[in-house]
A protein has these predicted regions:
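Glycine/charged-rich beta-loop-alpha catalytic/anionic-binding loops adjacent to active sites
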Residues: 6-11, 38-54
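Mixed-charge interfacial surface used for oligomerization/domain docking
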Residues: 27-30, 52, 58-68, 72-219, ...
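Glycine-rich, often proline-containing surface loops adjacent to acidic residues and nearby aromatics
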Residues: 5-9, 65-68
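A short, small-residue-rich loop immediately preceding and capping a beta-strand
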Residues: 9-13, 87-90
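Short Gly/Thr/Asp-enriched flexible loops that form oxyanion-binding sites at enzyme active sites
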Residues: 12-43, 67
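Active-site-proximal beta-strand/loop segments in catalytic clefts of secreted hydrolases
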Residues: 14, 56-57
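Glycine-rich oxoanion-binding loops at beta->alpha junctions
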Residues: 1-2
Length: 235
């Protein structure tokens, strides 16, 4: 429920290609601006109420870093239209690294996005040989960076890659990690501790949280996802 004093709402929606959430939010925004604007005027508030909806375009729901940067800019006193403009430019710089825990990840993901299965057969064979893929997602693109022997090795490589990006410099000072399991086990990993140290040294905020149910169902129990801002497109 919105307070009458609320001047604006800024929503970063799930990627439009992933479903109807973005279009539904646009429709809801129009209705909300009319209804809430009317309610404010009845209480003598002349300032117009506005709502913005941004298509995150990120793969696997990598909105976390976008939300963090949005909050930082607003706290710094940046105007909402300028924040929307900056977030729009940053969307394509979100890199998501995923270590799936389930061999059917590619099959489920391709069915969700309506794409041909990505390396589904080779991944299935690799899993039999205890080879775990490190998957990189950016926008609509999904690719296997490498396959490593064992899940723990793939997780370590993901953290090492992001640690290097933090040291090189990020487009925005945030890294979001989500895990489909007990977060305590992640905090104890040497590679995560090294990432924490790098973030502290370079004034980057690191968030660790439980993975959403929807993503956990997609990538499997025990899977890991890391969302940093890369320094440059194509980094």
């Amino acid at each position: 429920r919105l307070l009458a004093s609320t001047d604006f709402v800024l929503e970063i929606a799930q990627a439009s290609r992933r479903g109807n959430a973005y279009m539904n939010s646009l429709t809801a925004a129009q209705n909300l601006m009319l209804q809430h604007g009317r309610a404010r005027r009845q209480q003598g508030i002349a300032r117009p109420f506005k709502m913005w909806v941004i298509d995150s375009t990120t793969a696997l729901n990598g909105q976390g870093v976008l939300v963090c940067e949005c909050a930082r800019l607003l706290d710094d006193g940046i105007s909402v239209p300028r924040v929307v403009q900056q977030i729009d430019g940053l969307r394509q710089q979100v890199r998501t690294l995923v270590v799936p825990a389930d061999v059917s990840f590619f099959q489920r993901r391709s069915r969700l996005d309506g794409e041909a299965p990505l390396a589904w057969l080779s991944y299935g064979v690799g899993k039999v040989l205890d080879r775990t893929p490190l998957v990189r997602a950016q926008g609509a693109e999904l690719s296997v960076v490498t396959q490593l022997r064992g899940f723990d090795a793939a997780v370590a490589r993901a953290f090492e890659s992001v640690t290097q990006q933090v040291r090189t410099g990020l487009a925005a000072p945030f890294v979001c990690v989500s895990f489909a399991g007990d977060e305590t086990s992640v905090r104890q990993l040497p590679a995560f501790i090294a990432l924490e140290d790098a973030c502290l040294r370079h004034q980057v905020t690191l968030h660790l949280a439980s993975m959403s149910m929807g993503n956990a169902l997609l990538v499997g129990r025990g899977a890991l996802r890391v969302d940093p801002f890369a320094l440059h497109v194509g980094h």
